């Protein structure tokens, strides 16, 4: 799994020109799932994201987690994170998991985050054409790959 994590002041997802979900201050996570991902990836990545200390404390240091600032989480599936551009100019998405594998892992990831943060997680709709809007705070953008554990 690959996650692009963005610290935001606010973020929202529109589907068919209607707002589907929105958050105030917190994290926007773009989540890509590959065909080799499994439940261990879900557990490790959700725990890592939910405990990341990337929010400022009183001294201005990144020292607080999402729960410590009472922030919200918006998770959006994004298979294009596994694009390969090795050949030609059109990306290949062969490394992205097929929906029948990816959807259960996506749902497990959301459930794991809800359990760890003790809050309802806002989401996009898997496979939908979505418009994502955000105000990046910092900007702080972090890429985490569950296979590399970094």
UniProtKB/Swiss-Prot annotation:
InterPro entries: Daa-tRNA_deacyls_DTD, DTD-like_sf
Catalyzed reaction equations: glycyl-tRNA(Ala) + H2O = tRNA(Ala) + glycine + H(+); a D-aminoacyl-tRNA + H2O = a tRNA + a D-alpha-amino acid + H(+)
Enzyme class (EC, first level): hydrolase
Stored Pfam families: Tyr_Deacylase
Keyword Hydrolase tagged: yes
Main location class: cytoplasm
Subcellular location: Cytoplasm
EC number: 3.1.1.96
A GO biological-process term: D-amino acid catabolic process
MF GO annotations: D-tyrosyl-tRNA(Tyr) deacylase activity; Gly-tRNA(Ala) deacylase activity; Ser(Gly)-tRNA(Ala) hydrolase activity; tRNA binding
HAMAP family: Deacylase_Dtd
Domain notes: A Gly-cisPro motif from one monomer fits into the active site of the other monomer to allow specific chiral rejection of L-amino acids.
Its biological purpose: An aminoacyl-tRNA editing enzyme that deacylates mischarged D-aminoacyl-tRNAs. Also deacylates mischarged glycyl-tRNA(Ala), protecting cells against glycine mischarging by AlaRS. Acts via tRNA-based rather than protein-based catalysis; rejects L-amino acids rather than detecting D-amino acids in the active site. By recycling D-aminoacyl-tRNA to D-amino acids and free tRNA molecules, this enzyme counteracts the toxicity associated with the formation of D-aminoacyl-tRNA entities in vivo and helps enforce protein L-homochirality.
Protein name (record): D-aminoacyl-tRNA deacylase
Species lineage: Bacteria, Pseudomonadati, Bacteroidota, Cytophagia, Cytophagales
